[in-house]
Design a protein with these regions (language model features):
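Extracellular ligand-binding interfaces
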Residues: 311
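Carbohydrate-active catalytic/glycan-binding domains of CAZyme proteins
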Residues: 1-308
Length: 311
């Protein structure tokens, strides 16, 4: 019954008035490739549908490309909030759910790009938020575009700094800081997947989603006054997803007096430079074939800022 790219969310039950209080939990599964499905798991076997509940087919709207829904014409989406445009979700695959405050955030691989002036790609993670693990949902937008979106040289429009292919990932809070985990495709080769992590800032108000409550997720910058980073261009396009950097968990900047693998470069203007490494115990990646006019960039190094590192 459970299909492609599944994830399971176990909801803790601590309300004595809840029918599942004695058991202490409810479990849900979410899955699907270009077709989103979800249901509550049978707690007696953890793989079938819980008796008395149903499979939620066409759970989130799936897209062919950004803004173009691929589900059959006339498909109804009872798991969406009233008035929510199905074309805003752009689901592709890789469902993953987290609880944030009093709300739930669904992360998935989805199509993005035209919403900030770039071509459509499924190299992005998107998110939706709701009051329960089964919604109803509102689209939150892009969480991270693994192509590394930045303004171009003169700031007239946004551009990309990595090659495109699909991604998978989710959110996790560590020592009070939220991070998005995802992967990018060195050389644009889908079977070569480099794990990535970036900090994000999450704002969640206490109102229910049905009453206008929201979850807002943007890139985190420890040095900005509002702790937010955005990529904005003169043409009016703005990307608010996580920033693709070389830092990993060193979010106050890399120590400039240490050695690092060339494979953590976050800006490359040519293909086929990053070389495969098939040694599971060697966490390095070589860059080769670099000639004149090649650009390879690393960001950021913490010159003078590491004394402020608290995370």
């Amino acid at each position: 019954l459970i299909d492609f790219d599944p994830s399971v969310f176990v909801e803790r039950i601590d309300n004595p008035r809840d029918a599942d209080y004695a058991r202490g939990y409810r479990a849900y599964v979410f899955y699907g490739f270009r077709h989103s499905t979800a249901f509550e798991l049978n707690p007696d076997n953890m793989y079938g549908v819980r008796p008395g509940t149903q499979v939620h087919d066409y759970f989130l709207p799936a897209s062919e490309r950004y803004g173009v829904v691929r589900d059959p014409e006339g498909t109804q989406y009872p798991a969406l909030c009233r008035g929510q445009n199905p074309g805003d979700f752009n689901f592709f695959e890789a469902s993953s759910i987290r609880q944030v405050g009093n709300k739930y955030v669904m992360v998935f691989s989805g199509y993005s790009g035209p919403d900030y002036g770039l071509s459509s790609t499924n190299s992005a993670l998107r998110y939706a938020y709701g009051d329960t693990p089964l919604g109803p949902w509102r689209s939150g937008g892009v969480l991270v575009d693994s192509r590394g979106v930045v303004p171009n040289e003169n700031g007239s429009h946004l551009t990309t700094t990595n090659f495109a292919h699909n991604t998978h990932g989710s959110l996790q809070q560590i020592n009070g800081q939220w991070y998005v985990f995802y992967h990018r495709a060195p050389r644009g080769f889908g079977n070569a997947r480099q794990p990535m992590v970036a900090p994000v800032k999450i704002e969640c108000d206490k109102r229910s989603v049905a009453q206008g409550g929201k979850v807002r997720i943007v890139a985190y910058d420890p040095y900005a006054k509002n702790h937010e980073w955005t990529a904005a261009a003169a043409d009016g396009n703005v990307y608010t997803g996580a920033e693709v950097t070389s830092e990993g968990f060193q979010i106050f900047g890399l120590n400039p007096y240490q050695k690092y693998s060339a494979g953590i470069a976050c800006y490359v203007n040519g293909n086929n430079w990053m070389q495969d490494n098939f040694d599971n115990w060697d966490n390095n990646m070589d860059l080769a074939g670099i000639t004149n006019c090649c650009v390879v960039c690393f960001k950021y190094f913490g010159f003078g800022g590491l004394a402020h590192d608290t995370k």
